[in-house]
């Protein structure tokens, strides 16, 4: 039997809830956002991975977003209205992303996703603009379904 492709990505199947905490270079909180994230593997044409996100901001406003990942051999490729880039995984189950922002010229972020135990995961985003780090985002989530 052949092993399933992208096992570290597949480990994130399900619905996740938690927080996204944006912090500045001095580790001061800029914003704390409540998150609801659905990770799916729909097996539709080229779409290998689909993520749907609902973010609730401190002022009560809600942002909905979603994106698909296309299998490109050793990585998944993303091309959305706000970013373009790829994800891949390490041999020991860490998922990495490098995404160029379309909505912020000169900006990109690198994301590290680490699966914990008991249905928990940690994600960190390192934001760069014109080559300089300017923000980090700390995502703490738990699987709810």
Name the predicted role of every residue range.
Residues 1-15:
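N-terminal helix-cap/turn-to-beta initiation motif at the start of protein domains
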Residues 7, 99-104, 111-116, 128-131:
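Exposed beta-sheet edge/beta-hairpin loop segments within beta-rich domains
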Residues 10, 41-46, 88-91, 114-119, ...:
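A short, structured loop/turn motif at beta-sheet edges
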Residues 15-19, 121-123:
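A short, Trp-centered hydrophobic/proline-enriched beta-strand micro-motif
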Residues 20, 27-110:
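Central antiparallel beta-sheet cores of small beta-barrel/beta-sandwich binding domains
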Residues 23-30, 128-132:
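Flexible, membrane-facing loop/turn or short amphipathic-helix motifs
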Residues 72-78, 118-122, 145:
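Short, surface-exposed linear segments at secondary-structure transitions and domain or protein termini
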Residues 114-116, 124-145:
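Edge beta-strand at a domain terminus
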């Amino acid at each position: 039997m052949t092993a399933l492709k992208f096992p570290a990505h597949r480990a994130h199947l399900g619905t996740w809830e938690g927080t996204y905490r944006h912090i500045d270079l001095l580790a001061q909180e800029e914003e704390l956002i409540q998150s609801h994230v659905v990770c799916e593997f729909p097996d539709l044409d080229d779409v290998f991975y689909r993520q749907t996100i609902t973010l609730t901001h401190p002022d009560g406003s809600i942002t909905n977003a979603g994106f698909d990942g296309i299998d490109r051999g050793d990585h998944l490729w993303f091309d959305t209205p706000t970013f373009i880039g790829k994800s891949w995984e390490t041999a020991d189950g860490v998922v990495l992303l490098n995404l160029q922002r379309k909505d912020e010229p000169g900006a990109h972020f690198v994301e590290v996703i680490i699966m914990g135990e008991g249905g928990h995961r940690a994600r960190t985003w390192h934001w760069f603009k014109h080559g300089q780090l300017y923000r980090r985002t700390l995502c703490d989530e738990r699987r709810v379904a």
